[in-house]
A protein has these predicted regions:
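Domain-level signal for soluble alpha/beta catalytic cores
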Residues: 1-139
């Protein structure tokens, strides 16, 4: 796995595209659930992006902050499997893997910072060194 800082010294970093758009999860199923229910499908998408030339792929975990906030008991398993699948897909390449985290609701009962801390700690324990916090509002 290349150090993304070395790539960025030479050129922009080329990420994969949207997992949910490419995967087209089954109706009523969150894309992140496919980490557990269709791991081969998620691996196929990761590998397609790598074969297309992506320098980095994102874990299929964009929606986890929302799930963790809703206290979905499966968020940890989805995080673990999301990391495992992305790392497996990138293992024989020079691509970097980023733990991907989308927007989290910010409530008094469960502040967004607490959600992001729990998720970041989980991914760090799994070996993540790169994180992408995306599609966040400035509110």
């Amino acid at each position: 796995m290349k150090d993304v800082r070395e790539i960025l010294k030479k050129r922009p970093l080329l990420f994969d595209g949207g997992m949910g758009t490419y995967y087209k999860a089954k109706p009523g199923q969150e894309c992140e659930q496919a980490n557990l229910l269709d791991p081969d499908g998620i691996l196929t998408v990761h590998r397609a992006y790598l074969e297309a030339g992506a320098d980095a792929i994102k874990t299929n975990t964009f929606g986890l902050p929302r799930m963790a906030a809703a206290q979905n008991p499966m968020w940890e398993a989805m995080a673990d499997e999301g990391w495992k699948l992305a790392a497996q897909a990138a293992a024989k390449t020079s691509a970097a893997v980023f733990a991907d985290l989308g927007p989290a609701p910010d409530t008094e009962a469960l502040p967004a910072a607490q959600i992001y801390t729990a998720l970041a700690e989980r991914f760090a324990a799994l070996g993540a060194k790169n994180f992408l916090f995306e599609t966040l509002s400035s509110d």
